[in-house]
Amino acid sequence: MEIIFYHPTFNAAWWVNALEKALPHARVREWKVGDNNPADYALVWQPPVEMLAGRRLKAVFALGAGGDAILSKLNAHPEMLDASIPLFRLEDTGMGLQMQEYAVSQVLHWFRRFDDYQALKNQALWKPLPEYTREEFSVGIMGAGVLGAKVAESLQAWGFPLRCWSRSRKSWPGVESYVGREELHAFLNQTRVLINLLPNTAQTVGIINSELLDQLPDGAYVLNLARGVHVQEADLLAALDSGKLKGAMLDVFSQEPLPQESPLWRHPRVAMTPHIAAVTRPAEAIDYISRTITQLEKGEPVTGQVDRARGY
């Protein structure tokens, strides 16, 4: 079994060694320009077109929680990957716990009004504020996949009213489920904290815009943990300036690194991190990939395959 690996920033030698230990019958190599030798599987992140084009692979693994980086390149270069070759994304591999940590900490930060107390501290003002109640602090999760389910599960323990919005109805205990555009308004109008975990598809690009934000209660919060292209940044800033939104926490941006001239850097009610909410944890990724390859070789059912038509 031949496996090729490509990632622009990961330590390729470590991955090659770890994969060969996990799959003793495999020969793993780092792909380099000009390598046209046969391979059975490819592990990639933002691969050059020539790496995959024309190859008769059994499967491709995207080294991230989504396959959108490859799918977007396929739109421009359909010859890059034959439609018959399955594409897999990393299922959880430690990302679920990281998303739980991030989401819970930020919801509690807003719920306990730490953002307000930081603003008072900057003014040297000693001023206890009225508490929020859980009943008025409904959390809505856009995107009900593996990570959305993990975040909902972690927030349940804190007693917040929970709701989710997705393509298909969910039956998660203690979570109200809303489906499709026809139920989006009902989902939004009682959502105090909006958490975005949507996949990156043609239908979701720019979805967090002025029309959507206007349907949230006054003084709502937005937490974007999915993709920067989901947010119309000018609309978000306008909603913050008008008071429609009380705060935003952003981990992802339409352009990364975020340009120095972006007004997001300087807005007092925008907090941000540099796309670190849930990073690939190598050991857990190796475990998932090696297990899935073994199942594929045995003809067993597997999970994590990207539906190219849906985009996730």
Swiss-Prot record:
It catalyses: glycolate + NADP(+) = glyoxylate + NADPH + H(+); (R)-glycerate + NAD(+) = 3-hydroxypyruvate + NADH + H(+); (R)-glycerate + NADP(+) = 3-hydroxypyruvate + NADPH + H(+). This is Glyoxylate/hydroxypyruvate reductase A. GO terms for cellular component: cytoplasm. The gene is ghrA. The active site is at residues 227, 275. GO terms for molecular function: glyoxylate reductase (NADPH) activity; hydroxypyruvate reductase (NADH) activity; hydroxypyruvate reductase (NADPH) activity; NAD binding. InterPro entries: D-isomer_DH_NAD-bd, GhrA_Enterobacterales, NAD(P)-bd_dom_sf. NCBIfam families: PRK15469.1. Catalyzes the NADPH-dependent reduction of glyoxylate and hydroxypyruvate into glycolate and glycerate, respectively. Transmembrane segments: none annotated. Gene3D superfamilies: NAD(P)-binding Rossmann-like Domain. Its EC number is 1.1.1.79, 1.1.1.81. Belongs to the D-isomer specific 2-hydroxyacid dehydrogenase family. GhrA subfamily.
